[in-house]
Amino acid sequence: MPKVRRSRKPPPEGWELIEPTLDELDQKMREAETEPHEGKRKVEALWPIFKIHHQKSRYIFDLFYRRKAISRELYEYCLKEGIADKNLIAKWKKQGYENLCCLRCIQTRDTNFGTNCICRVPKSKLEEGRIVECVHCGCRGCSG
């Protein structure tokens, strides 16, 4: 996710209510970025970053669409400034993608056989006792 660049105009009304949570998530993101990755697989080093990015976008999504606690102006400000991922939120609004973990899991061009990620397979269609872990973001199943 790009570094937050605040525009010249001040944030809209209600920013002070969500700012502490966003600052806390930013701090977690910095810790995840500087965390040593010795002993981890190459792909595992990015999993905490994907998780925090998901949390931040889900926080803004829930405040606006579920709890209706923030204004449209503040929501659009968060999307414009890169605080939340607008493409991920757009997918969450579509049926079947409500719990999507990251956009890489639905991109078919990155796979050998042109399919979705293993975490997108419903648990009912997997073998009993099989532990699924997404290679991209570490998700254990976001399809339900």
Swiss-Prot record:
Pfam families: BUD31
InterPro entries: BUD31 (IPR001748), BUD31/G10-rel_CS (IPR018230)
Motif (Nuclear localization signal): 2-10
GO BP terms in the entry: mRNA splicing, via spliceosome
A GO CC term attached to the entry: spliceosomal complex
Keyword Metal-binding appears in the UniProt entry: no
Keywords of this entry: Nucleus
Signal peptide as annotated in the record: none
Keyword Magnesium recorded: no
Subcellular location: Nucleus
PANTHER family linked to this entry: PROTEIN BUD31 HOMOLOG, PROTEIN BUD31-RELATED
Family note: Belongs to the BUD31 (G10) family.
Name recorded for this polypeptide: Protein BUD31 homolog
Organism: Branchiostoma belcheri (Amphioxus)
